[in-house]
Amino acid sequence: MLHVGINGFGTIGKRVADAVRVQPDMTVAGVAKRSPNFEATIADDRGYDLYAADGREPFDEADLGTAGTVHDLIETSDVVVDTTPSGVGAANASLYAEHDTPAIFQGGEDADVADVSFNARANYEKAVGADTARVVSCNTTGLSRLLAPLRESYGVEKSRVTLVRRGADPGQTGRGPINDTLPDPVEIPSHHGPDVQTIFPDLDIDTMGMKVPTTQMHTHSVNVTLESEPATEEVTALLADESRLFLIPETLGIDGAGKLKEYTRDAGRPRGDVWENCIWAESITVEGRDLYLFQAIHQEADVVPENIDAVRALSERTASAEKSIRRTDEALGVGRGLVEHDGSPQRVDSHADD
């Protein structure tokens, strides 16, 4: 049983902890927090051992017991998943090295924070036995999952993606915009293209980014020039076969991210989370060698199964990407609980204790 420490219990950390808890080969060693805020209270209520990142006194004053400091958590963990805010993970890197504990960082860190940038579908094997890995950002994760099967089946000559990004997560009260549409950045490419190239170094990709006043999901407008000319139906079947790609049937009447999140909440997903890329099936179009589609990415959730797979890769628990992905998906419920593209319902009870 792998003992996994979670340093940080915010948007990503709490989801990773719950995902680790339901894995058959993992257990949560504990979670580290800087302050005894509501997230620390939730962690305690869920039965996770709390560790103090910046001293135990504030937790004692808040009557929240701690099992030790972050150093103690790292020492007791086989692998640590660092889900602290951007920049903090890089500052923590020396802690993990000091304790000789493999560590997984998030996509907000620069690529050089880790030995490898990681996406389970695209380059799992490169992280097997590594000391550190960086799970790429939510947008890069979504693009990598989409591009990997396209590259394998048809070859990719060039990718062009416009990313319409949510202004903030629901809990980020200090971010925006509130009433504007921003090119972000104005320069081309946005950082997303170079980040995808940390997964596919030889990929020709251009990306443009925008921010809009919503907290729902990111939406991508994708154009991929392939090296061959498959039929639209062939590409649709290829993508439908990927467990972490959900093709939204036209019959559901889901025309935006708001309805998509409403659907996943009603379907019983914990927190309404969408671990999969959500591709509008009717948007998939092939003209010559050019593929077009729209997809939505849930920025709070899509990297969660990737973190679980990264734990297995670093710990060398399995060298097989397919085996790890299947185990993660089965335990978490990825690829299930929603209506499949052929219209047949596939529902399972949620394993998460949310």
From Swiss-Prot:
UniProt pathway annotation: Carbohydrate degradation; glycolysis; pyruvate from D-glyceraldehyde 3-phosphate: step 1/5
Source superkingdom: Archaea
One Pfam family here: Gp_dh_C
Entry similarity comment: Belongs to the glyceraldehyde-3-phosphate dehydrogenase family.
Keywords, ordered alphabetically: Cytoplasm, Glycolysis, NAD, NADP, Oxidoreductase
Name of the protein in question: Glyceraldehyde-3-phosphate dehydrogenase
One GO MF term: NAD binding
GO-annotated biological processes: glycolytic process
